[in-house]
């Protein structure tokens, strides 16, 4: 825009003062000019000075209201370059504008999305970039609205980042994902821009290339901050979560890292960016998040924008002059002539000022009217778009109906063809064929109607599209005419000001330069003629503009009718609001009355609540008394068993007694806590009732097991144990009686139960059987020796099974070979599983020793935990012995010298032995140990392999045994009866033998558990079982003393004879 650099003082003295309204008008004018110059259809980058004025305007008015008021009227749908530069300005204003700009953008998100969708459906290079850029802007707006701690410029300190991320790992995880999405949108825009540009570096020096590259400056600024924040958040996530969980995050970060590094490298090589921005360099490789110290090596990338040289500002017009209406044309011509030769009197200056003011007011009026017309036209276009969308939806529905009609028509035609094929069947099908033909004709008629309707909708749609295009063209022509008028006004203003300056100079030198003025008369006359021609052209364009203005005024009248209709609807709505207000006042009166009633009901409820509270206290006390009475009955029953002669046959081990006494002693603490809570709040007795119930059961169990343990103990310890149990029962009954009395309940002392329970615990410890006769310093060596011997026994068993496999292949064939291979393969799998279990148990044992010995040596640790060590030795011996027995039984079965049942029993014994080894290893293992998890998995595998051995043995036994059918031919009734009686006799004999064997098995198990409980030496009848002395070094089976078990009941006779077998548990 042209402006006057040297303004005379007299003109400046006549300028009006800057009121608020004038300042606002000047601000709007400056913003409109900057927006129109920044966002245009020229393929050139946005000038920084125009964008800077728009950004300063947002800070001036603390928002972007003025910007959007002008930007919403831009014809963005007519030019993809215009839309691209519009997105660029949006990005700059969002980054550097006032913070309130973000909320103004939120209201126009739908407009931004519509622009992107519009150009996304068109095959245009800039249109594709506009679609991607709008997605980036929408993502940026959503992110900053959701996280207000991050400004639109993305520049925050590490403290603010830590505060925004918080301490919740879920929030950190989600924030990282959102930043990844943000970075993806930025990188996608940069990749799309580079994809459209030529690879030559010189492209960046062309205006078309610079137009595409200019927005990437903001992308570089955003990406540098996002990269730094994602690195920080990734390190924080790796400090809270395992590495496997974040594998997807690391892969996504590495992909973005390489894309960002490539983007920065390509941008650094372009000359266009070298003078505008200093791009940081990223490291050669991505950070190693698995190493926490790598965070100290991370360097924050910093983008530097060099200070620009101050651009020469385009001066603004100090005096704005518009074209005058047609009636004032002679006045303008006369003014130009008078400015050249001077006015005849001094009053013309005032007339010229008035004329300028009138022209300015008229131009402002026309401008306001034009803005209103443009807004109305935009609204009309929006309505047309809505109608087009509705018609398109209706057209789609008609297409669906047409498709459905075609399908129905095809089905009916198919039915008609079938009916025609069946025409020879008789007159019975004649009616059906006619009905099908009628349906087909009706369907065809409906199809033709739908086709006509479809054609009509297509024509309507095309007509609406033409109208929409005509309206857009009309608006474009109107805007071009307005710009032409503005240019003409600027030319006239410049010429008038130039003439005015020359006239003033002539007036000052008129006395001595009159002749010179006469010579210039002809030149001024020519200029006047040219000005008249320009004025006539302006008049013609003004007449055309006035005709278009009349058309728009007609549309304005129509819209005014719509406004009046809306005002009538508004009045009706206001009357409805008044009615609602009256109803609301009545409702408030009624609610005040109800409020008074509710207050009375509230007082009544409070009194009822007080009664219910007292009832609750009584009920809680009743529950406590009931629980105390039940506990008293349980304890009384336990105390009565101390003198019960029927209880003399019951026995228990000291180890079990110690475990029960310790549990009862631990329950005393819970009882004390529950008693304290009940005294603090009598409304809740649940804790005291639960603790009392647990204590009564555990105390009664301790008393009963103490008496049962005394039956196997020597006389003096047994008497002391019985006396202590009686004392414990008496104190427990006294405590329960105190809890039933409300007056004595606060003075009850549950801690008095600790002394008798500790006495029982100490006596149980004294009654435990002594350890094996092994020096404690030899235990560590014995453990390693026995584990090695077990591994060697298993390896030997595997080799023997392989030898048996090869021997069976040479000596057997057919079904026997198949059975033998199946049994030996299952035994081989079992041996491999046992070997893996022994290796895992050895690893777990070493882990236990290393974690538990502290500063002590390995031998000292084994000596300190001698019983656990003895358990490991016993378990390893059992596993080795079981493997040896399994191989021997399998050898006998293959050679047809043994029984299949021996192999089944050996499989069960191996499963029990491995369970014993697992139990011995789990005693001191950490529950979170990976070796313990693998040991348990190996134990389950051993059980599965043992079950496979049993299954293969049983199936092989059934396959080999002959199952001949009985031949009843030739037998008379007498012979059949005789054989039946003989079979019954045989069954009775076998049942008696089975019963005797079960009794013998029960006796053997009873003796076995007695010997295991006392750690005794096996009898001479079992030469294959070694002495428990560890110096023997034999791999025979040790006594199984680790698993508590009760002998099974065979029949009633066995119950009467032996009673209940005691449970023995050896603690390691």
Curated annotation (Swiss-Prot):
GO terms for molecular function: actin binding; actin filament binding; clathrin adaptor activity; clathrin binding; clathrin light chain binding; phosphatidylinositol binding; phosphatidylinositol-3,4,5-trisphosphate binding; phosphatidylinositol-3,4-bisphosphate binding. One of its GO terms (biological process) is postsynapse organization. The keyword Signal does not apply. Residues 592-608 have a biased composition (Basic and acidic residues). Residues 23-151 form the ENTH domain. Widely expressed. Expressed at lower levels in skeletal muscle and heart. The level of expression does not change appreciably during development. Keywords: Acetylation, Actin-binding, Coiled coil, Cytoplasm, Cytoplasmic vesicle, Endocytosis, Membrane. Residues 771-1012 form the I/LWEQ domain. Disruption phenotype: Hip1 and Hip1r double knockout mice are dwarfed, afflicted with severe vertebral defects and die in early adulthood. It is found in: Cytoplasm, Perinuclear region; Endomembrane system; Cytoplasmic vesicle, Clathrin-coated vesicle membrane. Its main location: cytoplasm. Residues 867-924 are annotated as: Important for actin binding. It comes from the Eukaryota. Binds F-actin via the talin-like I/LWEQ domain. Homodimer. Interacts with actin; homodimerization promotes actin binding. Interacts with CLTB. Interacts with HIP1. Interacts (via ENTH and I/LWEQ domains) with BCL2L10. This is Huntingtin-interacting protein 1-related protein. It comes from Mus musculus.
């Amino acid at each position: 825009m042209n402006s006057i650099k040297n303004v005379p003082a007299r003109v400046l003295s006549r300028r009006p003062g800057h009121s608020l309204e004038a300042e606002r008008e000047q601000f709007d004018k400056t913003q409109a000019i900057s927006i129109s110059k920044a966002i245009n259809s020229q393929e050139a980058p946005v000038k920084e000075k125009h964008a800077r004025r728009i950004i300063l305007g947002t800070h001036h008015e603390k928002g972007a209201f003025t910007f959007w008021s002008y930007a919403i009227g831009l014809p963005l749908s007519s030019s993809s370059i215009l839309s691209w530069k519009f997105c660029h300005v949006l990005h700059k204003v969002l980054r550097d504008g006032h913070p309130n700009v973000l909320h103004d953008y939120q209201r126009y998100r739908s407009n931004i999305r519509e622009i992107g969708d519009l150009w996304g459906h068109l095959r245009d290079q800039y249109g594709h970039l506009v679609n991607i850029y709008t997605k980036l802007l929408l993502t940026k707006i959503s992110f900053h609205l959701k996280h207000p701690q991050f400004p639109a410029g993305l520049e925050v300190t590490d403290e603010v980042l830590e505060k925004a991320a918080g301490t919740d790992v879920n929030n950190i995880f989600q924030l990282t994902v959102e930043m990844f999405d943000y970075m993806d949108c930025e990188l996608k825009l940069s990749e799309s821009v580079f994809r459209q540009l030529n690879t030559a570096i010189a492209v960046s020096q062309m205006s078309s290339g610079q137009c595409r590259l200019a927005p990437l400056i903001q992308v570089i600024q955003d990406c540098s901050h996002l990269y730094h924040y994602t690195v920080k958040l990734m390190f924080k996530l790796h400090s809270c979560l395992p590495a496997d969980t974040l594998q997807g995050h690391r892969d996504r970060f590495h992909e973005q890292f390489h894309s960002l590094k490539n983007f920065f490298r390509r941008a650094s090589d372009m000359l266009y960016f070298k003078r505008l921005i200093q791009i940081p360099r990223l490291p050669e490789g991505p950070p190693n998040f698995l190493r926490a110290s790598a965070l100290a090596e991370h360097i924050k990338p910093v983008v530097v924008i060099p200070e620009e040289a101050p651009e020469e500002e385009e001066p603004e017009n100090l005096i704005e002059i518009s074209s005058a209406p047609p009636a004032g044309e002679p006045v303008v011509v006369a003014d130009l002539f008078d400015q050249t030769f001077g006015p005849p009197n001094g009053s013309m200056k005032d007339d010229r000022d008035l004329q300028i003011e009138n022209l300015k007011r008229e131009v402002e009026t026309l401008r306001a009217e034009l803005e209103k017309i443009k807004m109305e036209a935009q609204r009309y276009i929006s309505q047309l778009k809505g109608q087009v969308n509705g018609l398109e939806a209706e057209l789609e529905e008609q297409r669906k109906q047409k498709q459905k009609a075609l399908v129905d028509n095809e089905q009916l035609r198919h039915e008609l063809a079938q009916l025609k094929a069946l025409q020879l069947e008789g007159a019975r099908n004649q009616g059906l064929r006619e009905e099908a033909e009628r349906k087909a004709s009706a369907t065809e008629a409906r199809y033709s109607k739908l086709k006509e309707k479809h054609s009509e909708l297509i024509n309507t749609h095309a007509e609406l599209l033409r109208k929409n295009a005509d309206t857009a063209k009309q608006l474009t022509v109107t805007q071009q005419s307005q710009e032409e008028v503005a240019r003409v006004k600027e030319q006239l203003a410049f010429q008038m000001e130039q003439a005015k300056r020359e006239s003033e100079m002539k007036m000052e030198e008129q006395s001595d330069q009159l002749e010179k003025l006469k010579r210039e008369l002809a030149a001024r006359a020519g200029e006047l003629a040219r000005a008249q021609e320009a004025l006539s052209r302006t008049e013609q364009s003004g007449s055309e503009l006035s005709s278009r203005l009349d058309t728009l005024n007609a549309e304005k009248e129509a819209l005014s009718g719509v406004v009046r209709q809306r005002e009538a609807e508004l009045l009706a709505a206001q009357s409805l609001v008044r009615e609602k207000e009256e109803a609301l006042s009545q409702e408030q009166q009624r609610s005040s009355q109800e409020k008074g009633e509710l207050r009375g009901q509230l007082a009544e409820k409070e009194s009822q609540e007080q009664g219910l509270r007292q009832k609750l206290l009584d009920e809680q006390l009743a529950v406590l008394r009931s629980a105390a009475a039940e506990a008293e009955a349980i304890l009384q029953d336990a105390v009565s068993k101390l003198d019960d002669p029927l209880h003399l046959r019951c026995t228990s081990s000291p180890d079990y007694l110690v475990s029960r006494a310790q549990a009862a002693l631990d329950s005393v603490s819970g009882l004390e806590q529950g008693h304290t809570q009940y005294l603090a709040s009598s409304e809740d007795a649940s804790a005291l009732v639960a603790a009392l119930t647990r204590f009564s059961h555990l105390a009664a169990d301790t008393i009963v097991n103490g008496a049962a343990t005394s039956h196997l103990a020597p006389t003096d310890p047994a008497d002391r144990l019985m006396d202590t149990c009686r004392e414990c029962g008496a104190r427990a009954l006294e405590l329960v009686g105190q809890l039933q009395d409300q007056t004595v309940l606060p003075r009850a002392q549950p801690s008095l139960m600790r002394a008798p329970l500790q006495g029982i615990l100490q006596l149980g410890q004294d009654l435990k059987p002594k350890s094996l006769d092994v020096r404690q310093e030899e235990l560590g060596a014995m453990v390693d020796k026995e584990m090695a011997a077990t591994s060697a026994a298993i390896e030997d068993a595997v080799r023997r099974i392989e030898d048996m496999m090869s021997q069976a292949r040479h000596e057997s064939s057919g079904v026997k070979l198949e059975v033998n291979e199946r049994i030996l393969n299952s035994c081989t799998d079992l041996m491999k599983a046992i070997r893996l279990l022994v290796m895992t148990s050895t690893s777990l044992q070493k882990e236990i020793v290393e974690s538990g010995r502290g500063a002590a040596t390995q031998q000292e640790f084994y000596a300190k935990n001698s019983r656990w060590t003895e358990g490991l030795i016993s378990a390893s011996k059992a596993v080795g012995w079981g493997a040896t027995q399994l191989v021997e039984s399998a050898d006998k079965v293959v050679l047809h010298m043994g029984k299949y049942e021996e192999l089944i029993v050996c499989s069960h014994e191996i499963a029990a032995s491995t369970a014993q080894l697992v139990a011995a290893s789990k005693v001191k293992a950490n529950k979170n140990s990976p070796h313990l998890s693998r040991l348990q998995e190996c134990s389950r595998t051993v059980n599965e392999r043992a079950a496979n051995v049993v299954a293969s043995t049983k199936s092989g036994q059934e396959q080999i045994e002959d199952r001949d059918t009985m031949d009843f031919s030739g037998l008379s009734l007498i012979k059949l009866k005789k054989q039946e009686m003989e079979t019954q006799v045989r069954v009775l004999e076998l049942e008696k033998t089975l019963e005797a064997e079960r009794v013998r098995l029960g006796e053997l198990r009873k003796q076995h558990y007695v010997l295991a409980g006392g750690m005794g030496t096996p009898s001479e009848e079992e030469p294959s079982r070694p002495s428990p002395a560890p110096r023997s070094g034999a791999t025979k089976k040790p006594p199984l003393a680790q698993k508590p078990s009760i002998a099974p009941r065979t029949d009633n006779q066995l119950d009467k004879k032996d009673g209940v077998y005691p449970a023995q548990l050896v603690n390691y």
